Each structure stands twice: as C-alpha cells, then as structure tokens.
C-alpha cells in the first residue's frame, strides 16, 4: 500500500515538473514574418537573399538556423532590410543576434559617409526576439514595422 502511494506521489511530482517546463513560443515562417513587415512599409524594391548571400553579407552560417528570410534593398542605395531567423537552439540564437548587431553597426558606419540620410533608419533599427526567432528591421517607419511584426507574432500564438 505504501509503495503504491509513493509511486502515485512520484507520478504527480513528475507531471508537475513537466508542466512547468519552459516551452518555446510559436513563431510564423520567416518568409511570412518578413512579408508582413514589408507590407507595412513603403520601401524601395526589395530582394530576398539566398542562404549563400546571407552568409556572405551577414556572416550567418546556414548551420545556425532552421528558417530564414532576409530582404534588402535591391539597389543597396538604402539601408532598408528585414532579416528574420529561426535559430536551431539558444546558443545559435545568440550567435545570430550577435551577427545581426554587427551587421547593423557595419551598415551604420558605411552609410554615415555614403548616405547620411539613411543613418536615422539605422539608428532606430528594431531588433526583437520571440522564442527562437529573432528579427532585425531597418525601415522608414519603425513603429509600423514593429506593429506588423507583433501582429503576426500574436496571430500565430492565437492559432496554436
């Protein structure tokens, strides 16, 4: 009888501990998140980068993420970009975030001399993370971009 009580107690404890386990937030596909942000903006013509070009321009290796969408100004005349990555794990997420921060800083230095009118966009660049998904947005209207991102993130949460 005592053995059965202990087993029941252990099962309840295991169930309670499993229920407290941290879950990752549901996130949309990177391409969907990028499209939502771009739809909120009046941007230059944007082009989506391949994994090879992501590694070349942003120094983010394909082994760090499970999904990505990076859209930049096709002409490179503006600093506008939407970079969305879903990392494989927390360690890789930190590496992606560091690379995005470095990219933004490098762009700021380049555009300071090349196109000083682009500097305010870079200075107000938005970097947000939800679960394993991190986003860098350099856009004409950072508030509208953030609202669009929050809307797709919250909409994704409601459907799960």
Give the role of each language-model region.
Residues 81-89, 133-139:
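Second-shell loop/turn segments in exported
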Residues 1-11:
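Positively charged n-region of N-terminal signal peptides that target proteins for export
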Residues 47-79, 91-95:
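Short, compositionally biased low-complexity segments enriched in polar/charged residues
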Residues 21-23:
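Bacterial signal peptide processing site
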Residues 93, 97-129, 159-160:
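Short Gly/Thr-rich strand-loop-strand
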Residues 28-46:
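Post-signal peptide N-terminal segment of mature Sec-exported envelope proteins
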Residues 74, 117-158:
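A short, solvent-exposed beta-edge/loop patch
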Residues 15-19:
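C-terminal motif of bacterial Sec signal peptides marking the signal peptidase cleavage site
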């Amino acid at each position: 009888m005592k053995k059965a009580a202990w087993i029941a107690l252990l099962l309840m404890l295991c169930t309670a501990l499993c229920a407290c386990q941290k879950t990752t937030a549901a996130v949309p596909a990177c391409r969907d998140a990028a499209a939502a942000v771009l739809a909120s903006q009046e941007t230059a013509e944007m082009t989506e980068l391949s994994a090879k070009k992501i590694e070349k321009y942003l120094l983010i290796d394909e082994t760090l993420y499970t999904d990505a969408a990076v859209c930049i100004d096709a002409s490179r005349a503006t600093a506008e970009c939407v970079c969305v990555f879903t990392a494989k794990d927390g360690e890789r997420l930190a590496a992606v975030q560091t690379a995005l921060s470095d990219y933004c800083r490098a762009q700021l230095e380049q555009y300071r001399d090349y196109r000083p009118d682009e500097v305010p966009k870079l200075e107000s660049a938005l970097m947000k993370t939800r679960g394993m998904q991190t986003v860098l947005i350099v856009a004409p209207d950072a508030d509208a971009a953030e609202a669009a991102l929050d809307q797709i993130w919250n909409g994704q949460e409601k459907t799960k």
